């Protein structure tokens, strides 16, 4: 239920993404008679397609190629990563170079796909979350994605929240801001 409400909020809030302010809204701002693009959900669907077609061959380069082929998002870190890749800058550098949003939240909010694809295998979830996040993020943006993918993957079998947090922390640098 919470996830569904979050997705609805993401869809209905999309016209205001990247804009700060208080809005006086009394109706939907877009046509909702059919599904509207949502870059975060769209990326997860593209990753599922990559898993289906590429299997274990998935790495950052493969994901960047799929991103470039299927995703139109040009905002923020998404656009920077894509533009860098189009200029021949390979992951993980395409997520780092000229990217003022490299530490942003775009990668961790889509990391659940790797947790579900690698249910109960946090190490594999961490690997794929790294491959994914390094296309458009670096540093804290990557650590957050890995941390979330790991704890969500482990949560399929571990229910103790404190243990899950410790498991997640074991996959990222001790001195990163996610841990501190």
List PLM regions with ranges:
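Structured, active/binding-site neighborhoods that engage oxygen-rich ligands
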Residues: 1-180
């Amino acid at each position: 239920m919470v996830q569904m409400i979050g997705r609805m909020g993401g869809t209905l809030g999309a016209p205001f993404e990247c804009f700060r302010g208080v809005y006086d809204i009394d109706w939907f701002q877009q046509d909702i008679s059919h599904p509207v693009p949502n870059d975060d959900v769209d990326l997860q669907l593209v990753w599922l397609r990559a898993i289906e077609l590429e299997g274990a061959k998935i790495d950052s380069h493969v994901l960047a190629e799929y991103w470039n082929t299927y995703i139109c998002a040009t905002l923020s870190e998404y656009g920077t990563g894509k533009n860098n890749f189009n200029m021949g800058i390979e992951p993980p550098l395409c997520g780092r170079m000229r990217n003022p949003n490299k530490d942003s939240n775009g990668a961790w909010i889509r990391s659940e796909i790797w947790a579900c694809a690698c249910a109960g295998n946090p190490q594999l979830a961490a690997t794929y979350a790294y491959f994914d996040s390094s296309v458009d993020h670096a540093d804290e943006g990557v650590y957050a994605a890995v941390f979330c993918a790991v704890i969500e993957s482990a949560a399929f079998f571990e229910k103790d929240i404190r243990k899950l947090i410790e498991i997640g922390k074991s996959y990222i640098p001790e001195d990163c801001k996610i841990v501190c």
